[in-house]
Amino acid sequence: MKRAFALLMALTMAAGLLAGCGSGSSTPAASSAAPAAPAASEAAPASEPAGQPAGGADKIVCGVVLIDMTNQFFVDMIEGGNKAAEDYGCEVIWKSADGNFDNQISLIENFIEQGVDCILVDPLDSEGLKPVIEKASAAGIPTITMAGQVDVETNYPTVYNDEENTRIIAEMTAKMIGEEGKTALLYGNKGNLVSDLRQKGYYAGMEKYPNITVVEQPTNWDPPTGMKAAQDLIAANPDLKAIHCISDAVTLAAYQAVKTAGKEGEIIVTSYDGNDDALKAVESGQFTSTVLTGAKKTGYWNIQVALQLASGVRPAEKILNLDTHFVMTDENKAKFAEMGIEGTEDVSVINPAQALERAAGYRDELYDPDLLAG
C-alpha cells in the first residue's frame, strides 16, 4: 500500500517489534516493540466489526494493558503512542497491571466489556493469556500481544529479534572477558516472551565458552529489584566480570550497585532498549553497549497497527517485526568488528549520537497520512 505499508514489508524481513497505542484517557504507560505500519493486508472477515477510520464520527478507541507504567521504556512508549493518537485522531486508554498477572486479565476483560476497538497487551504470561485473548476475539475485538506470541487467529504478536541480538551480546561479552570467568544475567520474569527470548539468547551465546559461568536473578522489570539483585550477585561473586540486564531501566539501577561496590571499570555492563539515559551511559563508558529498539517508535508504530486492525485491515504477516541497532562507541565498534562473531556481518552498529538522532526522528519516519486510505 502506501509508504508505511512498504516500510513494514522491508522491516518484517529484518527483526522484531512489540506494540502500543495512542493518546488520552486515564493512566499513561507503555509497551514493547515496533517498526513501521503493517505490510499489505486484506479486509477483516465480515463477522468482525471493524471500527471507524480515525478522525471519523466514531473515534477509534484502543485499550492498552502494560506490565507497569514506571519503567522508562514504558513511559517513552506511552509518549510515542500518544503522538500517534494525536496524528491519527484516535483515543487510547492506558492501564497498568502493576506486575500482576491477575490484574492483567481483569483489565483486558474490562476493555472487552467497554467494547474498545482494539486491545494491546504486554503479556506477563503469554500462554496464560490465551483464554482472555480468545474471549476478545469472540467479541470481535482484534488484539496485539506486544512481545508475546498467543496463538489466536485475530491476535497479532509484535516482537524484536531478541534472541539473536542477545546471543551476539553474550558472545561479545565472552570475547571482552577473555573467554573465561563469571558473568551475571538480570532477566525480567519467566513467561514473558521478551524476557524468555533474551535469556535464551544469552545462554545460547555463552554455550560456546565452557570456561564461562553464568549466574542470574529475576527482576520483574523493576529497577529497585534489579539493583538489589545486582548487589546480591556482586556480593556472592566477587570475581564477577560482567553483567547483562535485559532492559535499560534495570541496567541503570544495576550500574549503581556496580558503582557502590567500587567495581566500575572491572565489571562490564551491557544492556538492551536504548533509552536516552542508557545512550548517555554508553557514551560515557559506563555501559559497553545497548540495543536501540526505540520505545517511542515502538509506541507510535503499535498505534498504527492497532488503528489498521480496528478499521478492518489485516497485516499480510502474522508476526510483526521491528528493526534494532547495536549501540556502542566508535572505539568499541571497531573492536566488535574484529571479533568475528558469527551472524554479525549485516548487523547495524551505530554510536550514541546516531542512536539519539534515530530515536528522535521516529515520527517523521513513520507518519503516513494515507495509513487508513486502503
What are these regions (language model features)?
Residues K2-A10:
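Sec-dependent signal peptide recognition
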Residues M13, C21-G374:
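A residue-level marker of the well-folded mature domains of exported/periplasmic proteins
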